[in-house]
């Protein structure tokens, strides 16, 4: 049975600097690198106190956010959820979501299914400053 192995920190390009936010935001997409067919995977490191500038929703994709290090908060539609290490949060299609890091930063894995194919932007809608205090 064929398999694919990649190191999320060393083998994948960091797209974080392409976002118009914190310069030390880290965003590594593993879906294509791992040849995933049924799901998607990203690793994100959010600097302390930083709120991701965009909220987003998916038409068809369900996502699970797994906190591997740090803490933070997540806004899902109108509800705020506190996050700590090894929390897993499932977000269904159609729900708006955004997140921010706590004082020690936030590292998350995001698993999505189904795989969104060659143009994932067809499934997603995003809004800048969606989560405003």
PLM feature segments, named:
Residues 23-29, 42-58, 93:
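Conserved short histidine dyad/triad with adjacent acidic residue
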Residues 3, 98-133:
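Double-stranded beta-helix
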Residues 43-47, 57-75:
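Short, conserved beta-strand element in jelly-roll/cupin
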Residues 1-39, 48, 121-133:
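A short, N-terminal "cap"/entry segment at the start of jelly-roll beta-barrel domains
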Residues 36-39, 47-52, 71-73, 80, ...:
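Short, charged/polar surface micro-motifs in flexible loops or helix N-caps
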Residues 78-94:
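Short acidic-glycine-tyrosine-enriched beta hairpin
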Residues 60, 79, 95, 104-105:
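A generic "binding-loop/recognition-motif" signal
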Residues 54, 74-75, 91, 97-103:
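Short beta-strand His + acidic residue motifs that chelate non-heme Fe in jelly-roll/DSBH
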């Amino acid at each position: 049975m064929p398999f694919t192995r990649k190191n999320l920190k060393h083998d994948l390009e960091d797209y974080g600097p392409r976002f118009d936010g914190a310069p030390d935001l880290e965003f590594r997409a593993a879906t294509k690198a791992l040849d995933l067919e049924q799901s998607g995977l990203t690793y994100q490191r959010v600097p302390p106190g930083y709120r991701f500038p965009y909220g987003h929703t998916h038409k068809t994709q369900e996502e699970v956010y797994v906190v591997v290090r740090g803490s933070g908060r997540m806004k899902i539609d109108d509800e705020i959820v506190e996050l700590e290490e090894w929390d897993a949060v499932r977000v269904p299609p159609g729900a708006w979501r955004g997140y921010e890091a706590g004082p020690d930063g936030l590292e998350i894995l995001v698993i999505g299914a189904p795989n969104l194919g060659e143009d994932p932007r067809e499934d997603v809608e995003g809004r800048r400053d969606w989560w405003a205090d």
